[in-house]
């Protein structure tokens, strides 16, 4: 078996991402928690959940396993919401620090959002230069 065959025959998992929309306000925080718990095998370095309640975003993230980061008290403090996004990280680049945990909170004059992704920006420098030329501030 060649090295390529060995590589292609193995499971290649990276971060786990979970999202939910519930206009009736079903327990979004609990759904995100259980979704991340089920995806935790994809990344055990850090995890986070962000919940949007009528435009107000609450977020909690930290290093560690889902069950360690999200105690009952933390989950209750997040409150209700209609939209939730969760992320558990498997680092392929970057340091193992809480600053690299997701979801990312983005505050903009046109509104706020939480973003979780499963990948790496391989052309971050190029994108930054391009956007700065168009007037975007980083």
Locate predicted features.
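N-terminal glutamine amidotransferase
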Residues: 1-125, 130-133, 137
């Amino acid at each position: 078996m060649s090295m390529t065959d060995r590589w292609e025959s193995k499971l290649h998992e990276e971060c786990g991402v979970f999202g939910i929309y519930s206009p009736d306000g079903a327990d979004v925080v609990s759904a995100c928690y259980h979704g991340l718990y089920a995806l935790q095998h994809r990344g055990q370095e850090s995890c986070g959940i962000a919940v949007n309640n009528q435009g107000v975003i609450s977020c909690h993230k930290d290093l560690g396993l889902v069950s360690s980061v999200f105690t009952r008290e933390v989950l209750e403090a997040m409150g209700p919401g209609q939209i939730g996004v969760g992320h558990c990280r498997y680092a392929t680049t970057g340091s193992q620090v809480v600053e690299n945990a997701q979801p990312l909170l983005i505050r903009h004059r046109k509104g706020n959002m939480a973003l979780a992704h499963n990948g790496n920006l391989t052309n971050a420098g190029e994108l930054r230069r391009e956007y700065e030329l168009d007037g975007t501030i980083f």
